[in-house]
Amino acid sequence: GVGFPEKGTPQGGIISPLLSNIVLNELDWWVVSQWEEMPTRKNYVHRIYANDTPDKSCTIWVLRNKTNLKECYVVRYADDFKIFCKKRSDAVKMFEATKKWLMDRLNLQVSPEKSKIVNLKRHYSEFLGFKMKVRKKGKCKNGNPKYVIKACVKDKALIKIRKKAKDLIGSLRQTYDKHMEYRLIQKYNAYLIGVHNYYCIATYVNLDF
């Protein structure tokens, strides 16, 4: 028979990302309000860029040096999100506060298996098919170490990509029909171009393949 679920959305359904954005848009603004958009007594924005984006460098300096606020930034795609903090103690507080806010405000629970605090100086964190950590690269003007992102294709995604490419090559080798061969070559090239376009932003993608 045909079943009609009363809760949740189908895995991979096109409506799922849309609903996630509608519901979790409030989470984005809540995290931003804890740091980037925290109201200040004085307006520290002195210029507006050509694309109408305000220069918040002075505001950020004041928040970092004149307050006890926990610096944090959120990056989200659908229901998958990361919150970045400068210190582990801040990350622990933000982690607990976010779980509580999601439950109290949206009646949502985070996945215990997928949710954890990661030290990006020591370990990778995975997000949208990438794995990332930070590494030292020179020093800042004040003498403190400067860190840059190291992004690679995550291990599971790399295995899946290689298997798919191998299967496509296998199909190509087994055909002797010229028209089918042409279509398989097009399919193989389209797949590789798609993979390249998606992962080209990774800093170490040339070492992954």
Can you describe what each PLM-predicted range is?
Residues 1-209:
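Non-catalytic terminal/accessory segments
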